[in-house]
């Protein structure tokens, strides 16, 4: 292993198809030769935080290949000597197996993509329906607010009308009380007048009796004088 200021590389000599590990001691931008790529990102250039990263050396690599490690302050270069694959048949079988595995993974991912597309369409439709419902609810809410304001206005008018009616009723009650008092006074006066009328009737009868008695006496006296 070679100790560098920025990174450690697990091997400086490798065969085609091998994987070497790069350990970064600090964040850096790492650029690989085009015949190599990072196992995690499948790219040959990435800005990476400190950590260990696997680098795949493809069969297109041969000879001295370079890895550039760059930070804001410094740049280092690691050279890896890539030798020809000693067992190309095994590598071919491994590559075929890897391709088959990748195809299966692609099919699985395509299935997931198809599922998520359908799920997205369903969720999007639900979202559209919910949006429409929200719009309808917002419209209904605005209408209810307008109706509420109208009812509040009517309630205010009704409250004013009720106050006016209560005032009018109070005046009418006062008038009724005054009329009742007047009626009571009239009833008292009628009672007095009735009593006076009863006394006057009794006196009239008495005077009528006295009148007829006096008249009878005078008539009798007149006949008596005429006989003499």
From Swiss-Prot:
<keyword id="KW-0812">Transmembrane</keyword>
<feature type="transmembrane region" description="Helical">
    <location>
        <begin position="206"/>
        <end position="225"/>
    </location>
</feature>
<keyword id="KW-1133">Transmembrane helix</keyword>
<comment type="similarity">
    <text>To A.fulgidus AF_1225.</text>
</comment>
<keyword id="KW-0472">Membrane</keyword>
<protein>
    <recommendedName>
        <fullName>Uncharacterized protein AF_0540</fullName>
    </recommendedName>
</protein>
<keyword id="KW-0732">Signal</keyword>
<feature type="signal peptide">
    <location>
        <begin position="1"/>
        <end position="16"/>
    </location>
</feature>
<dbReference type="GO" id="GO:0016020">
    <property type="term" value="C:membrane"/>
</dbReference>
